[in-house]
């Protein structure tokens, strides 16, 4: 299995060769040369598998340069009930991603039972173990540079803390995460973790990461790696829970399901797209945005129009406060028939601060063939959805999951199960839950008092040169 760049000007590489990086040298994103296919018979064989067996079956089709026995050990080490221990009462932590039935054909897919209470743990824990393995095999070290709007940072840091050969430099928008998210990250005292609070918004952080990644000399000299959602291994890991969710709510492979996905950087729903391309019977992939609705605009109009920092809203679902969806390029590559020259043309416009219209050339008309639909929500919608869900079903959901549920209800079809991806637990967004319900959400006892722990972080300007200098001084 080789991986190619969406921009077509980088050599095809193996999984381990692209694992530690992010962007391809030509600025594109990596995808498999062709997607592995799972036949109806294969799906039937997978139906009864536990999460570890399912993950190994899927990942071994995407990773063929790590010996199967070693990959099996890595997967088994990653997906354990004691790692994903924060299941709801009545759920079995051994399921790793249990489903929670709200009503007939409407479910939550619980992806947030890991150490940082967010779905990012599903991929990041695997990434930490893969990084440690591959670095040890190569006798190398890496310095991870990442950007977070809230959940990626803590998931990356908890996955990489104490790992041999790894240092983490994580950029976050200063004072724009929830208190819980901030405390989760900044309270870590591990010597290999560095938190940098950037004066700006998430897209400023992401732009700095891209600028550093595109400085090939600096990247090579300082062994810069990436764990943001552009990292292929993260997307690959997320493919697994679409299969797990599908099997949990269907009796046979003749049935289709839909997934509603709270969306910012498009990485999570991109994994759903890839699962669908691999043969999973998915009816609809519902892209749910908040007020930062660049993706909703595209799926309704065919126009992709990223906003600048000044036009990016700070909302009550902050992990989705993103207006340049970095994984979107992967889907567009497939949409335009894997025409790398076309992708280079389109992202040339984006990288220059512009937009593009896929009605030109008739590409937008093909979006329906891939099952995508979309919708957006605002703060009032989120508060109402949290309140209604609590009253009707006796369950508390966070603001991002509320975005997903609100839009899911707009796209339900009779007889087709709809799984809403629960992307974070409500304890991470206490203020919003208090506003919606009048009381604080429950949080795991082990996380009581998190906000009062000592914090260690640096506040810096949104300047790639300043960040580079800090990295050089601390590696």
Curated annotation (Swiss-Prot):
One of its GO terms (biological process) is threonine biosynthetic process. Its EC number is 4.2.3.1. InterPro entries: Ser/Thr_deHydtase_PyrdxlP-BS, Thr_synth_N, Thr_synth_N_sf, Thr_synthase-like, Threonine_Synthase, TrpB-like_PALP, TrpB-like_PALP_sf. The modification N6-(pyridoxal phosphate)lysine is found at residue 120. It holds the Pfam family PALP. Pathway: Amino-acid biosynthesis; L-threonine biosynthesis; L-threonine from L-aspartate: step 5/5. NCBIfam families: thrC. Belongs to the threonine synthase family. This is Threonine synthase. It comes from Methylobacillus glycogenes. The gene is thrC.
